[in-house]
Amino acid sequence: PAGRARADGGGDAPDRRDPASLRIGGVTPFSSTDFPGRLAAVLFLQGCPWRCGYCHNPHLRESEGDVRHDYASFVGWLATRTGLLDAVVFSGGEPTAQAALGEAMQDIRSRGFAIGLHTGGAYPRRLAQVLPLVDWVGLDVKAPMPAYGAVTGVSGSGIAANASVRLVVGSGVAHEVRTTVHFDLTPPEALVALADELAAIGVRRWILQPFRPTGCAEERLVAAAPSGERVDEALLARLRERVPGVEVRGP
């Protein structure tokens, strides 16, 4: 019948590059921490190809997961926030997993909002396509390249991540690189090796975020998280010899 979307994506089903096809698993209507210096709404998009054990949004991993918000309703609400919000941040999941990301960014920019992106760099080709539309990137780097698969559960993932770091650094877009620190996955010597990799690419600002057990579905990592272990001053000094702008964020 006319007007019914067919299972094969025909009929009136939205094109996968139409912003209406964006699969949104969650929305934070107001954040002062997800885009430095800007007040932002955050869209959490469904889908991620990686299976990092410390992920605190595991419900967003599946691309066809629980889509809780539709794009049209979001932009309708966003129109009421003009003058109150500065930006929209696309997070996830892995936002670059969705083909409609660039079109959604263009649409929201046209409404007068800056664009932020949180990404792990799993899809460097799509990242390259959307970078010209982005005002700030928070890029999650998991581990030294040879150890990437042990964190993400996907062999070869370090190649994509390395390419994405190079893209972001070379783009001139404002950004920060950040790494979650759990010494079972990223012990001190791994962090030093990662600092060498990042320095060789030209990274100058690097945020270390201590592991947070909240939302982590992997009990092994929660149980192994040491109560008193921190990135100490001696380790920080070694890292800053390589990447001057290293900071520890959080407890």
Predicted region positions:
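Short, flexible loop segments at the rims of nucleotide/cofactor-binding pockets, characterized by
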Residues: 63-67, 93-94, 114-117
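Auxiliary Fe-S-binding modules of radical SAM enzymes
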Residues: 1-37, 170, 185-251
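Canonical Radical SAM [4Fe-4S] cluster-binding loop centered on the CxxxCxxC motif
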Residues: 33-69
